[in-house]
Amino acid sequence: EILDIFKITPKYDLDIMIERQTLEHVTSSILMKLSDILAKEQPDMILVHGDTNTCLSASLAAFYKKIPIGHVEAGLRTDDIYSPYPEEFVRRTVDSISSLYFCPTINNADNLIKENISKDGIYITGNTVIDTLQTTVKKDYTFKEPLLNRIDYNNKRIIPITAHRRENIGVNLENICNAIKTLASKYPDAHFIYTVHPNPAVKNTANRILEGIDNVSLLPPLIFTDLHNLIARAYFVMTDSGGLQEEAPSLGVPVLVLRRETERPEAVQAGTVKLTGVEYKNIVRDGRMLFDNKSVYDKMSNAVNPYGDGKASRRIVDAIKEYFKNL
């Protein structure tokens, strides 16, 4: 779907997705298939993005063939290798073998310098997701998810929710869902839209606690454009996701982060994001604060977005040109 938005036709499809596969299986499948492709194509550089298993596997495949790596969204850190898991390990590993580092913020660049990475390869670009929002968010937008077209956005306070991280499955997710249930009861004028990950451990908990509540909708994961346009119409967002901590503030929407730490402290420092955590009482407290305290809400929604001006992609292209020009 993202490829369609930007009219990109991939030359290769690794076709590795199967249900219930382990991290080890995903990593090895990508590594083996991509290794063959790199041997055939012999690229001058590969670009990897973020902190997924695909990012890790592609970086390893390139490193084994001594192909330079450019890491988009480099330098994010929580300082706890198991939180988020396995993303923190992925980005530390990828940054240890990259040649170019495209950092969303100054803080990310500083993290790399502290790890003795040369300044020569570090570029502060902003985040590419801000570039994307300029294409995906539209004033007159028809959602692909039918339910989203039936919502009264003018008279309802819309609260999109994502909560699916591995480290939150279990008691933490139950706390999150019970807090949503409490807030939904206290604020009948709000509509809580939880996009539920298909992982049975997530789906079963969400259904057990939240199914049947009038102002809570449980939806499958949304396509990219639906999610962005829903956020643009939201009152605030509740999430344990990384990307939404950047996307929502860019649209003037406050965020409650349902995690104990974040690799994106810039938004917390700027005041657009609050690190709420995973305790029931804290989630309810911070939710009520945004519903009831207009001055706090206005301060969060009007804070300056720290993640760039929508020109990150151009800066990345220019940095790559400079790299090869100086070889």
Language-model segment annotations:
Residues 1-194, 199-327:
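Nucleotide-activated sugar donor-binding and catalytic core shared by glycosyltransferases
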